[in-house]
Amino acid sequence: MTILRKSHPLMKMVNHAFIDLPTPSNISGWWNFGSLLGLCLIIQIASGLFLAMHYTSDTITAFSSVAHICRDVNYGWLIRYIHANGASLFFICLYLHIGRGIYYGSYMYKETWNIGIMLLFLTMATAFMGYVLPWGQMSFWGATVITNLLSAIPYVGSTLVEWIWGGFSVDKATLTRFFAFHFILPFIIAATAMVHLLFLHETGSNNPLGIPSDSDKIPFHPYYTFKDLLGVIIILASFLSFVLFFPDLLGDPDNYSPANPLNTPPHIKPEWYFLFAYAILRSIPNKLGGVIALVLSILVLALFPLLHTANQRSMMFRPISQFLFWTLVSDLFILTWIGGQPVEPPFIIIGQVASILYFSIILVFLPIAGLIENKVLKW
């Protein structure tokens, strides 16, 4: 008699995806972030659902409803801070997951990689709209500034912005639709993540050596279920410690003031996880040019499979590419720092140099490094 997990239609799908899945025997801790992203999504959907039960998406009561959640709802403060800091955890895991993909050449699975880029865009859109909901000063002005960027699009820009706003400024209509989209998008992300997994399981996982591992596979369960569980325990312990000891560390103090259209904050800036893109946007004096650079800073990821010139897939044995990769990581830290600084010397020139370096490493230096390594390593 066949065991149930191999015969039952639903259990069979779970079995093929998480139990009997043939997995390379040598994948490292860098492969834990996929499961951790799934955990983040579950945490965000669960905490968000409870917040939505008490939140009101009206300009007059939105700010008060968030205060009410923190003061009057049982453990409302905890749910709110888990949700707010959960977004930061989500992006930390996302960026590490993407970095792993770049370092070990996982982008060669084109379908999986491109769906991953779509997931990144969806997550960024969700996070942006969620930031608007508490209706504090930075929520309001962040929404105004970022949506206004669309007015740089020729011909249709201004009409498009008013269409998104639902009026002539960010107001009740904007807040209501942002709440609706913020609620539905995580479920779309979950569905897209399933497609991401589907394509990944068509090819099987990559591994640190970047070589085919068909001759050396082990079942996902129990080996990687327990390895993932260790990652989950470490991340949850760190995350809860952070939420309970430093809940406001990553937030903006301006967001504790109710939205006021008549008073502009001195420095309008997004959450820390968007600062690198914000720095690239600001480094170009032209509005349309800045918007194009902003979009390209993420879209450039789609070019990685096309710009791969090395004969080896992974960077594990490619010292020049390794150096460039870590330079790129350092550059992203610099851009993140610059994005949080005011637009004045010396920050302007540092941001411009860092932006040029970001695109140069990806589009020029890494492909050249691949060709040099082919020659030098006689591969």
From Swiss-Prot:
Bilayer-crossing regions: 33-53, 77-98, 113-133, 178-198, 226-246, 288-308, 320-340, 347-367
Phenotype when changing F365L: In strain: Isolate LVT 3645
Outcome following mutation: M118I: In strain: Isolate LVT 3645
Presence of keyword Cell inner membrane: no
GO cellular component annotations of the record: mitochondrial inner membrane; respiratory chain complex III
Amino-acid positions noted as binding heme b b562 in the UniProt annotation, renumbered to this chain: H83, H182
Pfam assignment, any one: Cytochrome_B
Consequence the record notes for mutating V376I: In strain: Isolate LVT 3645
Biological process according to GO: mitochondrial electron transport, ubiquinol to cytochrome c
GO molecular function, one term: ubiquinol-cytochrome-c reductase activity
UniProt: heme b b566 binding residues: H97, H196
Taxonomic superkingdom: Eukaryota
Result after altering V353I: In strain: Isolate LVT 3645
InterPro entries (alphabetical): Cyt_b/b6_C, Cyt_b/b6_C_sf, Cyt_b/b6_N, Cytb/b6-like_sf, Cytochrome_b, Cytochrome_b_C_euk/bac, Cytochrome_b_N_euk/bac, Di-haem_cyt_TM
Cofactors required: heme b
Residues noted as binding a ubiquinone in the record, renumbered to the chain: H201
Main location: mitochondrion
Free-text cofactor note: Binds 2 heme b groups non-covalently.
Family of this protein: Belongs to the cytochrome b family.
Subunit structure, interactors included: The cytochrome bc1 complex contains 11 subunits: 3 respiratory subunits (MT-CYB, CYC1 and UQCRFS1), 2 core proteins (UQCRC1 and UQCRC2) and 6 low-molecular weight proteins (UQCRH/QCR6, UQCRB/QCR7, UQCRQ/QCR8, UQCR10/QCR9, UQCR11/QCR10 and a cleavage product of UQCRFS1). This cytochrome bc1 complex then forms a dimer.
Function statement: Component of the ubiquinol-cytochrome c reductase complex (complex III or cytochrome b-c1 complex) that is part of the mitochondrial respiratory chain. The b-c1 complex mediates electron transfer from ubiquinol to cytochrome c. Contributes to the generation of a proton gradient across the mitochondrial membrane that is then used for ATP synthesis.
Designated name of the protein: Cytochrome b
Gene behind this protein: MT-CYB
